[in-house]
């Protein structure tokens, strides 16, 4: 009886070590934080999204990127919305 219990334990341990038991779980890798973005002229960079805090002095492509990725859109005379 002890031999059977020992063999069952070893077999289940081997399956866990090979990853056969938990096939349906969370398998995606943990995303890495975004790389450091150098500050651009026109205002400080927000540390969590890489978009300037103010709309002044940024290029059109950067403003469009911040708007499409984060919903932070620049409007003439109003600054960011969202």
UniProtKB/Swiss-Prot annotation:
| Pfam families noted in UniProt | Penaeidin
**One annotated GO molecular function:** chitin binding
- Does the record's keyword annotation contain Acetylation? no
**InterPro entries given for it?**
Penaeidin (IPR009226)
Q: Where is the signal peptide?
A: 1-19
Residues where Serine amide occurs?
Answer: 81
Q: List the disulfide bonds.
A: 51-66, 55-73, 67-74
The record's keywords, sorted A to Z, are: Amidation, Antibiotic, Antimicrobial, Chitin-binding, Disulfide bond, Fungicide, Pyrrolidone carboxylic acid, Signal
This entry carries the following GO cellular component terms, namely: cytoplasm
| GO-annotated biological processes | defense response to bacterium; defense response to fungus; killing of cells of another organism
Compartments reported by the entry: Cytoplasmic granule
Look up keyword Amino-acid biosynthesis and say if it applies. no
Question: Which residue positions does Pyrrolidone carboxylic acid occur at?
Answer: 20
Family per UniProt? Answer: Belongs to the penaeidin family.
Q: What does this protein do?
A: Antibacterial and antifungal activity. Presents chitin-binding activity.
This protein's name = Penaeidin-3g
Q: What is the lineage of its organism?
A: Eukaryota, Metazoa, Ecdysozoa, Arthropoda, Crustacea
